[in-house]
């Protein structure tokens, strides 16, 4: 048992079941899955994070790439939907990861960009809370994967290939 397996087992049971169910459905509807995540920084260097209504913890905004979408189309759609954010810089592809959560076929493209928020994001059916945070003062319950990505982005940790 490795560290990644231990971390996955530490998730609440209902979260593990939901993730497995989604990947089971994707097994029959998609050959491989591809998603985007965005490390969105404001002009003060703060990172934008979201809390979902259906998963515990704080995450980088993002989601799946749908048929007919490019990575950048999906990225702009997700930051708009999850945070009322607009790109203030050209998104830079930081790394592409293999996400072993639920399957061995899910890839996540992580982009870094500077953003502006058109209006504060109000809670909805998907996002219960969101905001910009200083990297030195992150909220409680930031997911381990999100913390690892932030450490990689800042140069404090080596980049790994697994989400």
Residue ranges and their predicted role:
Residues 96-120, 146:
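Active-site-adjacent beta-strand/loop module that shapes the phosphate/pyrophosphate-binding cleft
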């Amino acid at each position: 048992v490795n560290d990644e397996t231990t971390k996955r087992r530490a998730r609440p049971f209902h979260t593990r079941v939901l993730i497995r169910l989604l990947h089971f459905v994707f097994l029959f509807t998609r050959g491989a899955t591809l998603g985007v995540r965005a490390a969105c920084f404001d002009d003060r260097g703060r990172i934008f994070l979201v809390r979902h209504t259906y998963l515990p913890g704080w995450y980088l905004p993002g989601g799946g790439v749908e048929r007919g979408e490019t990575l950048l189309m999906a990225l702009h759609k997700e930051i708009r939907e999850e945070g009322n954010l607009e790109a203030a810089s050209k998104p830079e592809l930081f790394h592409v990861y293999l996400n072993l959560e639920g399957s061995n076929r899910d890839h996540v493209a992580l982009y870094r960009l500077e953003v502006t928020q058109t209006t504060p994001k109000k809670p909805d059916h998907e996002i219960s809370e969101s905001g910009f945070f200083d990297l030195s003062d992150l909220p409680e319950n930031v997911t381990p994967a999100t913390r690892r990505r932030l450490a990689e982005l800042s140069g404090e940790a080596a980049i790994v290939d697994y989400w």
